[in-house]
Amino acid sequence: MMKQTIAVICGGRSGEHEVSLTSAQSIVDALDRFRFNVLTIGIDRHGAWWLGSNVIDNLRKGQQPYGQRVYFIPDPTCPGLIEENPVTRKPVPVDVFFPVLHGPNGEDGTIQGLFEAANVPYVGCGVLASACGMDKAIMKALFAQSDLPQLPYLVVLRNRWESAREQVIDEVEDRLGYPCFVKPANMGSSVGISKATNRAELVAAFDDAVRYDRKLIVEKGINVREIEVSVLGNDEVVASVPGEIVPAHEFYDYDAKYAAADSRLLIPAPIAAADVATFQEMAIRAFRAIDGSGLSRVDFLLDKNSGEVYINEINTLPGFTSISMYPKLWEATGIPYGELLSRLVDLGLARYREKQRNATERLPRL
């Protein structure tokens, strides 16, 4: 069988640039070399695309040139990558693109739209699901429409915070109380999230979060366990065994995810068998609520006092580092890391083939 060429894309103009590089390195190392030729494309913090086997390491070190400069051409008649060469403009053939771009410009539908314009296969959720999964305000509205239980929350725009902060504080205290969490609506990996237990901490939390986004989410805080479920599929969807995060810090913030060695992942989560099915069913409903495809990780909050389950959020491009929950949950469910990557590629190709069935011009009635 002829090998397929997979282009893993990482880095990007995002606060999660470093996380993306770490995830991508794990994927590049684990892709099946008997089936795939693997290319690595790094996007620097200015948005330039670089191709090379050492591009991840070069981006980490700031060692320029990072690799061979390339451009992506969103033209369905000659789609894909072109090397920067004013004479030859040599194309770089790619069968499937594997975006590993966490955060804005990567998992928000931006690069997915580029792939769609070029009509090329890619791994993961499409434009709509990616955009809805990135914007927590839209995500929560879709969850509400699907009758998925959520904790009380508010959406606050940056300009409202800057022009009427006293009113915002009063509204948060009246409707949510303390503790509460403030987070950017369009960031992942817990970047910019803070817990507030009083007014001074609330002000500091808002001032930090507005550095990352114009739209903020404020959620009521309760005493919870953090449960996560991995989802895999297109129209036919399966869910993994649930896992539990026991954070080293008070909550699972950026440092707890990527720096603290004493955060623990309990896989499978120590929950009742009946609750396992509940989490899995809700995870699949959340995935379908955003019209997901390929993969997602769905995060839940389990109230330690009442036992109530609340959906927290869906992550359409979860971390793939060696300590990331998404691949670990599938390993515990019976799908090893390398096989998981192959399945994701197959799902991306299947969705592409399904899309090619759609007419691009008006057809006569049957």
Curated annotation (Swiss-Prot):
Residues holding Mg(2+) 1: D299, E313
Major location (coarse): cytoplasm
Known EC number: 6.3.2.4
Record bears the keyword Manganese: yes
Residue intervals of the ATP-grasp domain: 140-346
Superkingdom of source: Bacteria
Subcellular location per the Swiss-Prot or TrEMBL entry: Cytoplasm
Keywords linked to the UniProt accession: ATP-binding, Cell shape, Cell wall biogenesis/degradation, Cytoplasm, Ligase, Magnesium, Manganese, Metal-binding, Nucleotide-binding, Peptidoglycan synthesis
GO biological process: cell wall organization; peptidoglycan biosynthetic process; regulation of cell shape
Catalytic activity: 2 D-alanine + ATP = D-alanyl-D-alanine + ADP + phosphate + H(+)
Record: residues binding Mg(2+) 2: E313, N315
A Pfam family it matches: Dala_Dala_lig_C
GO annotations of cellular component type: cytosol
InterPro entries linked: ATP-grasp (IPR011761), ATP_grasp_subdomain_1 (IPR013815), D-Ala_lig_Van_CS (IPR000291), D_ala_D_ala (IPR005905), Dala_Dala_lig_C (IPR011095), Dala_Dala_lig_N (IPR011127), PreATP-grasp_dom_sf (IPR016185)
Pathway(s) this gene product operates in, as recorded in its UniProt entry: Cell wall biogenesis; peptidoglycan biosynthesis
Position of the signal peptide: none
Chain residues that bind ATP: 173-228
Keyword Glycosyltransferase set for record: no
Cofactor: Mg(2+); Mn(2+)
Cofactor binding, per record: Binds 2 magnesium or manganese ions per subunit.
Family listed: Belongs to the D-alanine--D-alanine ligase family.
Record function comment: Cell wall formation.
Protein name: D-alanine--D-alanine ligase
The species this protein was found in: Heliobacterium modesticaldum (strain ATCC 51547 / Ice1)
Gene it is expressed from: ddl
